[in-house]
Amino acid sequence: MKAENTTLLLVEDDPNDVVLVQRALRRAGLALQVRSAGSVAQARAYLTGELPYADRAANPIPSMILLDLKMPGGSGIDLLTWMRARADTRRIPVIILSSSKEQGDVDRAYDAGCNSYLVKPVAFDALQEMFVAFGRYWLEFNTAPELQRISRSTVQPS
């Protein structure tokens, strides 16, 4: 997986954290196409190609997802469970990015099918350094699965 061909869906409800993550990714040298969704409902709409995300040229299928756990209107675990139950989304790598270090949250995330669990550092420099390592692993060393094309014809009922 190469960064310039990689679309990352950032599912995060805090607009300040969205900006912070995008800036840290850029400063880490990762030229990813970042799309964001501020809720579980928006992420589901993005993944299934519902309006306003129907244009796949503008809203490509993500190669990976950075997912917050605690959001209003549904948790990251809810989205992850939904994704893993669907043929068209189950192979998309999901990396939890949460401020929670609670072992119960970590265990629930892995039980639901996350591929990695990262704890958001408080300091920006530490976040940037985390994304340098993230990029090396996910974009240089990891061999990604083939993802099904998600189109309106492959969308399964929720």
Role assignments for model-derived ranges:
Residues L67-L69, S98:
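Active-site residues of response regulator receiver
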Residues S36-P52, G76:
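Helix N-cap/capping motif at the beta->alpha junctions
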Residues S39, P60-S63, S75-D78:
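Acidic catalytic/metal-coordinating carboxylates
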Residues P52, I77-R90:
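Short amphipathic alpha-helix used as the core "switch/output" element in two-component signaling
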